[in-house]
Amino acid sequence: MAHKKGASSSNNGRDSESKRLGVKRFGGQQVKAGEILIRQRGTSFHPGENVGRGGDDTLFALKAGAVQFATKRRRRVVNIVENEAVEA
């Protein structure tokens, strides 16, 4: 049995497509309802006030407001702080 590889054969050349995970909206940023805040695998960040969690653990805004990161019982939590109604 020959132990030389055939010409131009290679064992390399495979890699999975990047999943584009991470924080998409940072602390203090204004967001609208439905905007994705964090894409993650597992719950590195937990949903807080006005934040929902999708089936793939994605966190998204339920209401418009400012993004706020906090810790609660040693968990990293993401909240949306609603903007105060401005009366003209």
From Swiss-Prot:
One of its GO terms (molecular function) is structural constituent of ribosome. One of its GO terms (cellular component) is cytosolic large ribosomal subunit. InterPro entries: Ribosomal_bL27, Ribosomal_bL27_CS. One of its GO terms (biological process) is translation. Keywords: Ribonucleoprotein, Ribosomal protein. PROSITE patterns: RIBOSOMAL_L27. Pfam families: Ribosomal_L27 (PF01016). Residues 1-27 are annotated as: Disordered. NCBIfam families: L27. PANTHER family: LARGE RIBOSOMAL SUBUNIT PROTEIN BL27M (PTHR15893:SF0), RIBOSOMAL PROTEIN L27 (PTHR15893). Belongs to the bacterial ribosomal protein bL27 family. This is Large ribosomal subunit protein bL27. It comes from Corynebacterium jeikeium (strain K411). The lineage of its organism: Bacteria, Bacillati, Actinomycetota, Actinomycetes, Mycobacteriales.
